[in-house]
Amino acid sequence: MKTVYEIQQFLKQFGTIIYVGDRIADLELMEAELTELYHAQLIDVKDFQTARLLLRHEIQFLKEKRKS
């Protein structure tokens, strides 16, 4: 997974569609859902780590952008 869109499509395979209207909240909910899937052993560690890193990077980018 290389984009947030790919993570959304990945989560959709598990029946999860996240949209609350706030981009940062959406990303944080995606991260929480990925964590739940990982703890339930439904996704492997590589997919989990890659997706989580990408989401955290995007969240940090958006938070810094809001401050400016």
Where are these regions (language model features)?
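N-terminal acidic leader/helix
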Residues: 1-24
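Charged low-complexity stretches with an acidic bias
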Residues: 1-8, 55-68
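Short, charge-rich amphipathic interface segments used for partner binding and complex assembly
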Residues: 29-61
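Short, structured secondary-structure boundary patches
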Residues: 11, 39-45, 66-68
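Residue-level detector of alpha-helical recognition elements and their boundaries
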Residues: 22, 26, 49, 63-66
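Short amphipathic alpha-helical interaction patches enriched in hydrophobic/aromatic residues
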Residues: 15-18, 38, 63
